[in-house]
Amino acid sequence: MTRKYFGTDGVRGKVGDAPITPDFVMRLGHAAGKVLAHGARTGQGKPTVLIGKDTRISGYMLEAALEAGFTSAGVHVLLTGPLPTPGIAYLTRALRLSAGVVISASHNPYYDNGIKFFSASGDKLPDAVEAAIEAALDEPMVCAPSDDLGRARRIDDAAGRYIEFCKSTFPYEQDLHGLKLVVDCAHGAAYHIAPPVFHELGADVVAIGNQPNGRNINAGYGATAPEKLIEAVKANGADLGLAFDGDADRLQVVDADGRLYNGDELLYLIVRDRQAAGQAVPGAVGTLMTNMAVELALKREGVDFVRAKVGDRYVLEELNKRKWTLGGEGSGHLLCLDRHSTGDGIVSALQVLGALRRSGKTLAQLLDGVKLFPQTLINVRVQKGFDWQTHAGLQAARAAVEPELEGRGRVLIRASGTEPVVRVMVEAEQAEMAERAARKLADALGA
């Protein structure tokens, strides 16, 4: 089913351009109130939603618009102010609310923003529910009678509740005493959350990217720009650096030598730590982009590996379908469903730190069994509407290349969703092998 407004992670765009305008967001709140809240079980007595945001300047405007939309539909609203996306998921479930809403564009620049929803159980909405909200958007917006309007109020203990939840996912018998951490909050929603979490567990914390001004979120700091973190780890003689993005649902880690570890490697580490603790891990879920070295390493440890479409929502769907608990993406979205219902950068960092504490080893030592395969990516510009899947020359080249890579590499070809480009990606044990195969495939397309 084609969706008009919802993408892979809610509704997102440039502030001031449709659909991220105050009038549309108010109508979105009203439509979502009708679909999500009415009839939902709630501990508040009346349908009630939780609204949180990151630190973008536009969050004030969009928060007010959502508040108007929900209350006009007869739904109560609780406002948290700036809080990581996974914190909203947790509190929605913990407070027994009808739904949760986050105003954030995650790792995007400050001039973008978005709206995403969580169900009463703290899960991302399935496609069918998003389609129902879109259908409700096409209906006239009819305000509830005055006696039925919702109320809005701020809750003051949201940050403290979420900090305690994060700490509860770290083994009680362990602590972080003697560990020096640099924590990069991307000037985003974790600025007042992440440093206290690690400090209260005993770490010596150096916080950077923790002075949001509404316009500096993700700007040169955070999981998508780790250079400042690498510098700070070295300058402070820290043991580790942790980088979150603007809404703190993704994680990148830097060791004392300045080496950066991505989500693929961290997923492997968490799986192996669960096994070391005596837990059965039947399988893990990655995406089409997960490095093949991780897949092979997991299979050597008896762990099945499945690839989902790119996007943490699809990783989550695959995990739920198989009743597995661990999955993630190279970008740093990591899912530990035995700890939280959604991807959580802070909780993921605590799982990594727990593995280090339990093993007494360094990151490099724990990941010695995973040497990421080199990747070669070639973007081939094509005519609009070009069907690469039936291109005879490409199919012939692929048939020649793939047997050479079997067990030592793989091919991924996909069309860009935003421009007339076909992306040819090859990864292999040796860089030369990947480059040679990618060039052969790109040449077949006429690059």
Curated annotation (Swiss-Prot):
Which controlled-vocabulary keywords does the entry list? Isomerase, Magnesium, Metal-binding, Phosphoprotein
What EC class does the entry list? isomerase
What task does this protein carry out? Catalyzes the conversion of glucosamine-6-phosphate to glucosamine-1-phosphate.
What post-translational changes are documented for it? Activated by phosphorylation.
> What protein does this entry describe?
Phosphoglucosamine mutase
Write down the required cofactor(s): Mg(2+)
Tell me the protein family, please: Belongs to the phosphohexose mutase family.
User: Source species, please?
Assistant: Cupriavidus taiwanensis (strain DSM 17343 / BCRC 17206 / CCUG 44338 / CIP 107171 / LMG 19424 / R1) (Ralstonia taiwanensis (strain LMG 19424))
Which Gene3D superfamilies does the UniProt entry name for this protein?
A: Alpha-D-Glucose-1,6-Bisphosphate, subunit A, domain 3, Alpha-D-phosphohexomutase, C-terminal domain
Q: Which residues form the active site?
A: S106 (phosphoserine intermediate)
The residues the record assigns to binding Mg(2+) are S106, D245, D247, D249
Q: Which lineage ranks, top first, belong to the organism behind this chain?
A: Bacteria, Pseudomonadati, Pseudomonadota, Betaproteobacteria, Burkholderiales
Q: For the modification Phosphoserine, which residues carry it?
A: S106
Xref: SUPFAM superfamilies: Phosphoglucomutase, C-terminal domain, Phosphoglucomutase, first 3 domains
Q: Known HAMAP family for this protein?
A: GlmM_B
Instruction: Copy out the cofactor comment.
Output: Binds 1 Mg(2+) ion per subunit.
Coiled-coil stretches are: none
- The EC number(s) attached to this protein equal 5.4.2.10
Name the gene for this chain: glmM
Q: Which residues form each disulfide bond in the chain? A: none
GO CC annotations on file: cytosol
Name the chemical reaction catalysed here: alpha-D-glucosamine 1-phosphate = D-glucosamine 6-phosphate
GO terms (molecular function) for this protein are: magnesium ion binding; phosphoglucosamine mutase activity; phosphomannomutase activity
